[in-house]
Regions:
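Alpha/beta-hydrolase active-site loop
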Residues: 111-136
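The feature captures the conserved acid-bearing segment of alpha/beta-hydrolase catalytic domains
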Residues: 167-247
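N-terminal cap/lid segment of alpha/beta-hydrolase-fold proteins
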Residues: 20-60
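Short beta-strand element of the alpha/beta-hydrolase
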Residues: 60-70
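C-terminal catalytic histidine-bearing segment of alpha/beta-hydrolase fold enzymes
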Residues: 228-309
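Primarily recognizes the serine-hydrolase "nucleophile elbow" in alpha/beta-hydrolase
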Residues: 129-194
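Cap/lid segment of the alpha/beta-hydrolase catalytic domain
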Residues: 72, 98-119
């Protein structure tokens, strides 16, 4: 059973991601993460973070961005640092956190304590607690979060453990694993605290793990006509969901890692280059830049693509 469940959200090592210019020095610290061996929050894990350019954004303190990597993804791999550099460039103390993401069996009972370990507002040794204690952080301005695959689950659950989490951008996740017919009710909208108009999720149409419109709608809270590729909040704040079509990325296959130029059209693969329609300066509604711009407004304003895509 473990070997089957491992396939749900396994992310391989990213190679040669065409990252944006790195801004600033990467600093490190540690926090106490959830330890499945003791069922307690006593597993020392690492945090890496960058500060904004003080010439542009002032001396701080700054609002906080937190990125959670996917299964088997390391917290400082090129994908994680792409997010960190981009959010530091938007005026955030931008951090990426390691957690126990190597365990094969992944269910709500394992996801929820991992998320609590990262975001818990009541524990000074959580990742959020450590970051918010920094003289460079002002968490009263707000925390925003993002993550891919299992990391997307962490981000969606974040506000359940920390009311300072104001907006979330999640990638490649839903409430149902197609390959093993496993449901994740913990991330369904009735069970999450984050308002639906502060959540954006972008998935690939050919994702063999978390694909499908209904499982995505269950997490988002927004429902559109069957066959829709995008669905946005009626209040115009830019929250909602997007399903990237196979024709929209360079490789012609929008799998679990649609944001990478994956060799061989393998929907399971997460090894490759950053897809040019996802990386900056691409400005589609599913591209990285516009979604991080939306996140930087704490989920209140989106600049929609003039192409409609």
């Amino acid at each position: 059973m473990k070997s089957v469940l491992w396939l749900i959200v396994s992310l391989s090592v990213y190679c040669s991601l065409q990252a944006a210019e790195r801004r600033g020095t990467t600093l490190t610290t540690t926090y106490q993460s959830y330890n499945p061996n003791t069922d307690n929050f006593n597993l020392t894990q690492s945090i890496a973070y960058q500060l904004p350019n003080s010439s542009r954004f002032g001396p701080g303190p700054y609002p906080v961005f937190m990125y959670a990597p996917g299964t088997y993804e390391t917290y400082t791999d090129p994908l994680a640092m792409e997010f960190v550099a981009a959010m530091a460039a938007r005026g955030f103390l931008a951090a990426t956190v390691q957690y126990d993401n190597n365990e094969a069996v992944q269910t709500c009972s394992t996801y929820t304590p991992r998320a609590q370990g990262i975001y818990d507002v009541n524990r000074s040794t959580s990742a959020a607690g450590v970051l918010c204690s920094s003289p460079y952080a002002n968490c009263t301005k707000g925390i925003v979060s993002s993550g891919v695959s299992q990391g997307g689950f962490m981000a969606v659950l974040a506000a359940n453990y920390n009311p300072k989490v104001k907006a979330v951008f999640a990638l490649s996740m839903s409430d149902y694993a197609l390959n093993v017919s496993l449901s994740y009710p913990c991330v369904d909208k009735p069970n999450t605290v984050l308002p639906e108009n502060r959540l954006t999720i972008v998935n690939g149409a050919a994702d063999p793990f978390f694909g499908g419109q209904q499982p995505l709608e269950n997490v988002s809270g927004y429902t559109c006509a069957n066959g829709s590729s995008q669905c946005w909040s009626p209040d115009g704040d830019g929250a909602g969901w997007y399903i990237v079509q196979n024709s929209q990325n360079k490789n012609g296959y929008a799998g679990h890692c649609y944001f990478l130029d994956v060799a061989g059209n393998d929907p399971n693969s997460c090894v490759g280059l950053g897809d040019p329609s996802w990386l900056p300066p691409a400005d589609y509604n599913w591209s990285l830049g516009p979604n991080l711009d939306w996140l930087a407004t704490f989920g209140t304003k989106r600049n929609f693509s003039s192409s409609g895509q």
